[in-house]
Regions:
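Glycine-rich beta-strand-to-loop/alpha-helix junction loops that act as flexible
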Residues: 53-57
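Nucleotide phosphate-binding site architecture
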Residues: 60
Length: 321
């Protein structure tokens, strides 16, 4: 089963011994293996599929806008146009099998039950199991989750260099590699929508899985994006946000019909709860910051304020779109 090398193990211990970081060794270990999984994907023949890195891990590793551990790897898939529904599903299935094989050949353990596919393979989640050489970290899951969504990016993408937290800390650029990445603007719109729609889904009792108490990460991430790109305060991606909302409404119409009928109302209810019933959100946020943020911390009040202001602008523009 996949594990870090003896040299990597020593480097992680040296970081702790030299007081370069107070983070548990298991966090560096998981990030290192996650980065290696990314490297294998970047060098894989995607057989005509466009592969675009996105999400919080992209913000951390590629755009370098957030200083937190992100243990999920998210990708958008660009499927060739002109395929029939059957051909599209088959093409996505072939890609899924190919990627699983790539991870297995890299040493990760991928049991069949750890591969989930929905919507004719338009959504695929793969859990990569590895052997840890350190004590478990309570805040981390024991697997690396890789998700693929066959919804292409709308805004232009760009290749960016990727490196591990370990390499970043010791200023080692020798093993950098590039991967196509989603834009910051698109990420901002997705994070606002993800927090609002997924929280609203739970409040409506329409969630398939248990509530993800780390959804509050989107508040932290949005604040970090705006801190580095202040233009987004006055120029948020209105049109793109509206397109994303329409896409989610269509994708989840069977699971969450209320969202298709009134997406703005459902999301505004969450914004109101964020201020009127903040206790649960603040508890989750403080725990998230304590366990996974290794850079400068941001208070719940500040993150909520920045997020709410942006979300309010984006939702307000929906009535005129």
């Amino acid at each position: 089963m996949k594990t870090i090398t003896a040299q990597e193990h020593k480097q992680i211990l040296d970081i702790r011994n030299e007081s370069l970081s107070s983070l548990p060794p298991g966090i560096f270990e998981k990030d290192l293996l996650l980065t290696q999984a990314l490297r294998h994907l970047a060098s894989t023949d995607s057989e005509g599929m466009g592969l675009v890195f996105c999400g919080g891990t992209c913000l951390s590793k590629a755009h370098r806008l957030i200083e937190r551990m992100s243990e999920d790897v998210d990708f958008k898939l660009v499927v060739p146009e002109g395929l029939s529904r059957t051909a599209r599903s088959k093409r996505l299935s072939q890609f899924k099998k190919r990627v699983v094989l790539v991870f297995q050949e890299a040493g990760f353990h991928v049991p069949p039950e750890q591969v989930v596919a929905r919507d004719e393979n338009s959504y695929v989640a793969i859990n990569l199991l590895y052997e840890s050489r350190f004590s478990p970290v309570a805040s981390l899951r024991p697997e690396i989750k890789v998700e693929f969504n066959a919804r292409p990016p709308v805004l232009p993408t760009a290749p960016l260099p990727i490196r591990s937290m370990l390499a970043e800390l010791i200023a080692d650029r020798a093993d950098d590699f590039q991967i196509e990445c989603i834009s910051v603007d698109e990420t901002l719109a997705e994070k606002v929508l993800s927090f609002l729609r997924r929280t609203a889904e739970v409040r409506a009792g329409r969630n398939r899985a248990e509530y993800d108490d780390r959804l509050v990460r989107h508040l932290y991430d949005v604040q970090a994006i705006v801190a580095h790109h202040e233009r987004l305060k006055s120029e948020p991606p209105h049109a793109h946000f509206a397109a994303l909302v329409a896409g989610d409404a269509a994708q989840y119409r069977n699971q969450y019909p209320e969202f298709e009928l009134d997406p703005v109302g459902q999301m505004r209810d969450v914004l109101q709860a964020l201020h009127a019933q903040p206790d649960g959100f603040e508890r989750d946020y403080l725990q998230f910051v304590d366990e996974l943020v290794f850079g400068e911390t941001v208070s719940f009040a500040e993150a909520r304020s920045v997020f709410s202001e942006l979300a309010d602008q984006l939702l307000g523009s929906m009535h005129s779109v």
